[in-house]
């Protein structure tokens, strides 16, 4: 399981000219599920993102989590994070999870995430999404579980 999280002042996801997710201060998380991912991976990733201290405290130190500041998050499914880029000039997705399985796995991750934290919005799996955000920092982290 892979994720890139970004601390944002605002973010939104639009599909077919319709806004499907819209947050103010919080996290935009690009999430990629892989073939071998299990519920345990989903639990660990959700905990990591929810508890990761990327927001500044009163002293300006990154010491506060999503929960600490009661912020929102958008989970955006992004299979391209699993691309093999080692050879040539075109990404390969041959080792990726088939779309129908990846969709089920992403939904399972989303459900686990929602059980742990309630201020969650999502993009739409498989849709052509227009994602816009205003980075805060920028502060960006990459996770592999």
Swiss-Prot record:
PANTHER family: D-AMINOACYL-TRNA DEACYLASE 1, D-TYROSYL-TRNA TYR DEACYLASE. InterPro entries: Daa-tRNA_deacyls_DTD (IPR003732), DTD-like_sf (IPR023509). This is D-aminoacyl-tRNA deacylase. Its EC number is 3.1.1.96. Gene3D superfamilies: D-tyrosyl-tRNA(Tyr) deacylase. The keyword Lyase does not apply. A Gly-cisPro motif from one monomer fits into the active site of the other monomer to allow specific chiral rejection of L-amino acids. GO terms for cellular component: cytoplasm. The keyword Iron does not apply. It is an enzyme of class 3 (hydrolase). A motif (Gly-cisPro motif, important for rejection of L-amino acids) lies at residues 137-138. One of its GO terms (molecular function) is Ser(Gly)-tRNA(Ala) hydrolase activity. Homodimer. The lineage of its organism: Bacteria, Pseudomonadati, Pseudomonadota, Gammaproteobacteria, Thiotrichales. It is found in: Cytoplasm. GO terms for biological process: D-amino acid catabolic process. NCBIfam families: D-aminoacyl-tRNA deacylase. An aminoacyl-tRNA editing enzyme that deacylates mischarged D-aminoacyl-tRNAs. Also deacylates mischarged glycyl-tRNA(Ala), protecting cells against glycine mischarging by AlaRS. Acts via tRNA-based rather than protein-based catalysis; rejects L-amino acids rather than detecting D-amino acids in the active site. By recycling D-aminoacyl-tRNA to D-amino acids and free tRNA molecules, this enzyme counteracts the toxicity associated with the formation of D-aminoacyl-tRNA entities in vivo and helps enforce protein L-homochirality. It catalyses: glycyl-tRNA(Ala) + H2O = tRNA(Ala) + glycine + H(+); a D-aminoacyl-tRNA + H2O = a tRNA + a D-alpha-amino acid + H(+). Keywords: Cytoplasm, Hydrolase, RNA-binding, tRNA-binding.
